[in-house]
Amino acid sequence: MPMQKLILVVLFFMNAFTSIKAQKNNDEQLAMQYYERKEFDKAVVYFDKLYDKLPDAYFTYYYTCLIETKDYNKAEKIIKKQIKRNPTATNLYVKLGKIYRLQHNPDKEKEQYTKAIKEVIPEQNYVFVLAHAFEDEELYDYAIEVYMKGRKNQKDTYPFYYEIADLYKKKGDLKAMINEYLDAIEFRESELYTAQANLQQSLGYDDKNGGFNNPLLKQELQKRIQQHPDKTVFSEFLIFIQNQQKDFEGSFVQNKALDKRQKGDGTRLMELAKLCVSNEKYDVAEKCYQYVISKGKDNPYHDVATIEKLNANYLQLTTSVNP
């Protein structure tokens, strides 16, 4: 082939390639413009072409357009195609289930959700993707079921306590939410402060008016203490709440029980007594000091407790005489 003809052929293919690329870029720009404007009836025309060329890249956009334009049959078709291409992407079954829900076919909808949970690989990343797919559709019970399956497989590494707790919160089941956070603390005591922070955010926390506002937390903590007396972290958590709420009688009971269990020297009771005095709860302060005194003269706090008890008694008398 003469050089001149060869150059012409090369130029022809270069121009053709450039033209095709420019057309693709133009289609993509128009598709995204219409999509962002929520003009799905116009966007779907372009995504139809783009999806044929790069199905994985444009699937989500195309699927959304088909749902918004109520072309459920075509949406069903492309999802099934994607499932064949990506059999481990069980979140696609959730999208398929959504189509059946929109078509008022609850049996087929449920079938897809059940299949998704059955086939999901119970590893952290796969579990997250499927659970989030259910959560995006506000199918919280299914999302919880996914995490529970993941928990069975990863119970010693990452049991999904925080994710499940958040879902119970969204469902309005505060008791179940609280118990997930308490399970996290039981699983690993170092989770206390993270769980505490999440509970403060979820239950409401007012430092000026007694800390945690919801009585459910105290109730569930008391149950845990009875069930697991060896887990002192629950007693510490309850004491923290009682002190915040100025429930010093309750705090005295818990501190005394904890001191006995740990065969302590009364340090925690001495600290509570100071807190009681500063809040003018002299009767509870006297109980704290008396408990320490009862440990005997060999206790390092015996003499201090004796003096401080007299001081608390004096303050109580003078305060009641001169309110």
Residue ranges with predicted function:
Residues 14-15, 284:
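Alpha-helical transmembrane segments and their juxtamembrane interfaces
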Residues 18-22:
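Sec/Tat signal peptide C-region and signal peptidase I cleavage site
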